[in-house]
UniProtKB/Swiss-Prot annotation:
Keyword tags: Membrane, Transmembrane, Transmembrane helix
Organism: Buchnera aphidicola subsp. Baizongia pistaciae (strain Bp)
Function: HflC and HflK could regulate a protease.
Annotated protein name in UniProt: Protein HflC
One annotated Gene Ontology cellular component of this protein: membrane
Main location: membrane
C-alpha cells in the first residue's frame, strides 16, 4: 500500500511540476496543443511573455523563441556595378521575430538556419539589383542613405499571401534531396520577409572593397597612367633640353660672330693706324722706307732652307742694289 501511495505521490509531483513553465527574459513562447498552435477566443495566437505560466501536461507543449535582436554578418563577392566594376561588400543585418506563429509555421520548429538563409538570399538579391543601377561614386555616397533604406523597406513590405501555406518541413533522420528541393522552392516563393514573421530593423554596408581581378586591373591602369605621365615629362624634358641647347648654340654663335666682328674692326683700325703711322714716317724719309722694304724682302727670300738661290748680277737691278753697297 505504501508503494502505491509513493508512486501516486511521485506522479502527482511530476504532474504538478509539468504544469508550469518559465519564459526567460529575451524570450517568447507559444503553446502547442497536440502539436497544433493554440489560439484564444478571438482566434489570436497566444504568445507568452517572460514569467511563470501554466499548461496542461502531456497535452500541451511549449515552443520558446529568441525575441532579441539578432545580427547576420554577410559577405557578397563579385557584385557588378553600373560601370561594370566588381565589388566585394561586407554587410550586416539586424533582425528579430515579430510574428512567432508565422515564424514557427514558416521555419519548421524554429530552425534559424532557414530564416537566416532566406534573409541573406533576399537581402543579397535586392542589394545586387540596387547596385547594378549605380556606379562606384553613387554607391559610396548612398551607402548610409537611400540605398540601405530602400532595401530595408522592400524586405519589410507587407504581403497578402497566406503564410499558413508556407511551411518548411524538417527531416528528422537526415535531409533528403527531395526535401532540399522543396525547401529551395519555398524560399523562392516568398517575396518578402514579413511572410515568415521576421522584421528587418537595420541593414548596413560595413566595408566596400574591390575584387582581386579588379584590384589588379586598377594597379595595372595606374601603372600605365604613371608610365604615360613619366613618358610625357621625359618628352617635355628632352624637348626643353633641345630648345635650351639650340638657344645656347645660337647665343654662342651670336657672341662669337659679334666678337669676331669687333676683333676684325679693331684689327682693321689698328692696321689702318699702323699704315698711317708708317706712311707718315716714311713720307718724311722715302729712301729709308725703300731700304726697310728691301731688307724685309731679302729676309723672306733667304730664310727658306733647302732651296737653291740663283742671283743674277745686274748692276742696274733696283731689288739688289743694297746688296752691292760698299
Amino acid at each position: 500500500m505504501r508503494k502505491v501511495i509513493l508512486i501516486i505521490l511521485i506522479v502527482v509531483v511530476i504532474y504538478f511540476f509539468t504544469c508550469f513553465f518559465i519564459i526567460k527574459e529575451g524570450q517568447r513562447g507559444i503553446i502547442l496543443r497536440f502539436g497544433k498552435i493554440s489560439y484564444d477566443d478571438n482566434h489570436h495566437v497566444l504568445v507568452y511573455k517572460p514569467g511563470l505560466h501554466i499548461k496542461l501536461p502531456f497535452i500541451e507543449s511549449v515552443k520558446i523563441f529568441n525575441s532579441k535582436i539578432q545580427t547576420i554578418d554577410n559577405r557578397l563577392d563579385s557584385v557588378l556595378t553600373k560601370d561594370n566594376k566588381n565589388l566585394v561588400l561586407n554587410t550586416y543585418i539586424n533582425w528579430k521575430i515579430n510574428d512567432f506563429c508565422r515564424y514557427y509555421l514558416s521555419t519548421g520548429e524554429d530552425n534559424i538556419y532557414y530564416a537566416e538563409t532566406l534573409i541573406k538570399q533576399k537581402f543579397n538579391n535586392r542589394l545586387r539589383a540596387q547596385i547594378s543601377h549605380l556606379n562606384i561614386k553613387e554607391i559610396i555616397f548612398n551607402v548610409k542613405d537611400q540605398l540601405t533604406s530602400n532595401i530595408k523597406y522592400s524586405l519589410n513590405a507587407s504581403s497578402k499571401i497566406n503564410y499558413k501555406n508556407v511551411i518548411f518541413k524538417k527531416a528528422i533522420n537526415g535531409t533528403s534531396n527531395q526535401n532540399i528541393n522543396q525547401e529551395n522552392n519555398l524560399l523562392q516563393s516568398i517575396s518578402d520577409l514579413s511572410e515568415i514573421g521576421v522584421q528587418i530593423l537595420d541593414v548596413r554596408i560595413g566595408k566596400i572593397s574591390v575584387s582581386e581581378d579588379f584590384f589588379s586591373l586598377i594597379c595595372s591602369r595606374i601603372n600605365s597612367e604613371y608610365r604615360a605621365i613619366a613618358k610625357h615629362y621625359r618628352l617635355m624634358g628632352d624637348k626643353q633640353a633641345e630648345e635650351l641647347k639650340l638657344r645656347a648654340n645660337y647665343e654662342v654663335v651670336k657672341i662669337l660672330s659679334k666678337a669676331q666682328r669687333s676683333a676684325l674692326i679693331i684689327k682693321s683700325e689698328g692696321e689702318a693706324l699702323v699704315a698711317k703711322l708708317f706712311s707718315d714716317a716714311f713720307s718724311q724719309e722715302p729712301e729709308f722706307f725703300s731700304f726697310i722694304r728691301s731688307l724685309q724682302a731679302y729676309e723672306n727670300i733667304f730664310k727658306k732652307k733647302n732651296q737653291n738661290l740663283i742671283v743674277v748680277n745686274e748692276n742696274n737691278s733696283s731689288f739688289l742694289r743694297y746688296m752691292y753697297i760698299k
